């Protein structure tokens, strides 16, 4: 069982209620495996709370937003203001720790800056007009990056993640810097993403992630975790493309 210091107040009460319910179930290998699988899915959904809410709003506005606009507010501004309200609500109702909110702010700022560059470079466009924007970038877009930051911070906390055979920190810093540089530089020079993929594999192929689900700790290669996370981000990006939140060709999985 995780220590209570890793939970918000609400999460602590949920965890205690889950133990009261599930600890009374008959114990054998099948029921233990099913319990771990169920709790794993629920915790993943909890970690994706902000990102799931944002993606849900993007889909709903794709289906139900008036074709000519809502008059008093644009779709992009509605998404931006909704994201702000969701974040405030998560903090007020203790669905999120303050440390996670700080991560979200950082990811939003960095993500918005990246969006400004990418739209200027012509990678994609935001076709609709709105008020809350910087250049051609509506501010709701930064919250899509923030959703990734939220997930990373929350999953590390609620799964009590520990890493074995992690390479020296400086190597991660160098790799991250190279990835960000390539994000901008590949518009002007050779795209080295495949070199970066190879470097990522070389650095982390021995690293394993240990995490607690409910009763037991489990182990997963860190590269598998990277792959699964990237896959779901790719799916979410293509849902955003389908919803016409931005305009570009469907994103290739190598992106």
What are these language model-derived features?
Residues 34-51:
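N-terminal membrane topogenic signal
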Residues 52, 56, 101, 105-117, ...:
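Hydrophobic, lipid-facing residues on alpha-helical transmembrane segments of integral membrane proteins
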Residues 67-69, 92-101, 116-128:
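Transmembrane alpha-helix boundary signature
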Residues 80-91:
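Central hydrophobic cores of alpha-helical transmembrane segments in multi-pass inner-membrane proteins
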Residues 86, 149-157, 179-186, 198-217:
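Alpha-helical transmembrane segments in multipass membrane proteins, preferentially the mid-helix core
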Residues 91-102, 156-167, 211-220:
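Membrane-interface helix-boundary motifs at transmembrane edges
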Residues 130-144, 254:
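Short aromatic-rich membrane-water interface segments that cap or initiate transmembrane helices
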Residues 249-255:
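Residue-level detector of conserved catalytic or cofactor/ligand-binding positions
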């Amino acid at each position: 069982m995780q220590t209570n210091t890793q939970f918000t107040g609400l999460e602590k009460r949920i965890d205690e209620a889950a133990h009261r319910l599930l600890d009374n179930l008959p114990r054998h290998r099948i029921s233990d495996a099913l319990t771990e699988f169920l709790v794993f899915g629920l915790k993943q959904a909890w970690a994706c709370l902000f990102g799931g809410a944002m993606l849900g709003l993007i889909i709903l506005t794709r289906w139900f937003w008036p074709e000519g606009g809502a008059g008093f507010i644009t779709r992009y501004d509605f998404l931006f203001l909704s994201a702000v309200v969701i974040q405030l609500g998560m903090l007020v109702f203790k669905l999120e720790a303050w440390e996670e909110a700080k991560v979200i702010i950082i990811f939003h700022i960095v993500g918005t800056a990246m969006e400004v560059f990418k739209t200027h470079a012509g990678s994609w466009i935001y076709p609709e007009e709105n008020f809350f924007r910087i250049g051609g970038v509506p501010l709701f877009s930064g919250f899509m990056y923030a959703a990734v930051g939220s997930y990373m911070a929350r999953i590390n906390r609620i799964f009590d993640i520990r890493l074995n055979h992690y390479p020296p920190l400086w190597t991660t810093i160098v790799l991250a810097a190279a990835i960000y540089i390539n994000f901008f530089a590949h518009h002007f020079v050779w795209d080295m993403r495949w070199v970066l993929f190879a470097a990522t594999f070389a650095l982390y192929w021995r690293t394993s992630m240990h995490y607690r689900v409910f009763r037991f700790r489990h182990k997963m290669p860190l590269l598998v975790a990277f792959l699964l996370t990237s896959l779901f981000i790719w799916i979410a990006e293509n849902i955003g493309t389908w919803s016409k939140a931005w305009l570009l060709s469907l994103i290739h999985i190598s992106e």
